Amino acid sequence: MANNNNHLVIMAGGVGSRFWPMSTAEKPKQFIDVLGVGRTLIQLTLDRFEGICNPENVWVVTNKAYADTVAEQLPDMPRDHILCEPCRRNTAPCIAYVSWRIKSKDAKANIVVSPSDHIVMNNDEFRRVVKQCMKFTGETDAIVTLGMKPNRPETGYGYIQADLSTSSPRNKEIYRVDSFREKPSQEKAMEYIRNRSYFWNAGIFIWSVSTIVNAFRVYQPAINRVFENMLPILGTEKEQEEIDKHFPECQSISVDYAIMEKAEEIFICPADFGWSDLGTWGSLLVQTKKDLYGNSIIGENVNIYDTHNCIIHTLGHKRVVVQGLDGYIVAEEDGRLLVCKLSEEQRIKEFSAE
C-alpha cells in the first residue's frame, strides 16, 4: 500500500529528436509505444510506481502542447496536476515549480522525480530500491539520486562518483556522493568502469518537499522567489496566467548544476534494474530482445532475410521486408521512413531537419 505522503513527479516536456521518425515535436517518444507492448513510455513510467504513489499524488510537468495527450494517456491522475511550462528552461525551474505546488497541498510530501521516456526491465527491483530511498529521505534532510551500475564504457551518460568507503548508518545501500562527472571520452569511461565507484546518472531524484524547497532557497534564490511569491495563487484559476508571465524569468539550468552539485547532503543509491534512457535507436537495440542474428524487431508484419544486427520498428499492420542489411535502423512512423546505419545515428537530427 502506497504512503499517502508519497508523490511522483514525471518530467514529460522533452522532444526526443534523435528518435525520428517515431518521435517528433508534435508527438515525442514519451507518448509512443516504443517497445510494441501496448503501453506508451509515459504509461510504463507510471506503471512502475504502482504501490509507491497513489494516482491522486501523481504530477506531470510538460509543455502546453502535450497537456491533452498526458490527460488522455494517464486518465486516473488529477487533471490539475498536469503542470504546463510556457517555455523550456531545463529541469531546475520546472522542479522548483512542481515542488512549491506540491508543498501548497502537502507540506509533509516525500517526492520521487522521474523522466517520462526511460525504460526499466526489472520493475520489482526498481520498486524495492525506490521504496527504501523514500524511507531514507522521509527520515532525513538528504537528497538521493539513483546511480546505475555500468555494464559498458558508455560515453553518452553523465557519471556520479560515490564514496563507497562508508555507507549511511540508516541504509547500507546508500552512500555519499563524491562528485558528478560530465559525459566522458571513451578512455575516461573505461577508467570509470575499472574504478567501480562510478555510476550512470539516471536523472531519478528522491527528496522531501521541505528539503528540495530549502535547497532552492539556499542555492537558487532567484528561481525560488519566482514560485514562492506565487504560493497564494498556486492551485487556483490564476495559476497558469501567472506561470506564463513569470516562468520565463527563470534561468535555464539543470537541477544537476543548480542543486545537486552545490548541496551538501547528497547521496546515491547504486542500483541495477535494467535501466536505459532510450536516448537513441542503438540504446533500444541494446535493451530489447534480439533474434539469433542480433536483430531487434518491433512490428507485427516484418520479414527479414540475410539481415544482421538491425533494429526494425514499425507499428500497425504494414508489411515490411528487409533483405541484406547489417547494422541498420529501419523505422517507419506515420508515413515517414528512416533507413540509416546505426553507426551514423548521431546524424538523425540532421537528416530529419525540415
Predicted regions span which residues?
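General beta-strand structural signal in soluble alpha/beta enzymes
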Residues: 60, 83-84, 113, 144-148, ...
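Left-handed beta-helix
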Residues: 2-5, 209-354
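Residue-level signal for inorganic ion chemistry
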Residues: 42, 98, 117, 160, ...
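Conserved N-terminal catalytic core of the sugar/cofactor nucleotidyltransferase
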Residues: 1-10, 18-25, 36-115, 121-131
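Conserved core of the sugar-phosphate nucleotidyltransferase
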Residues: 123-243, 267, 317, 341-342
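Short beta-strand segments
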Residues: 11-12, 61, 112-115, 145-149, ...
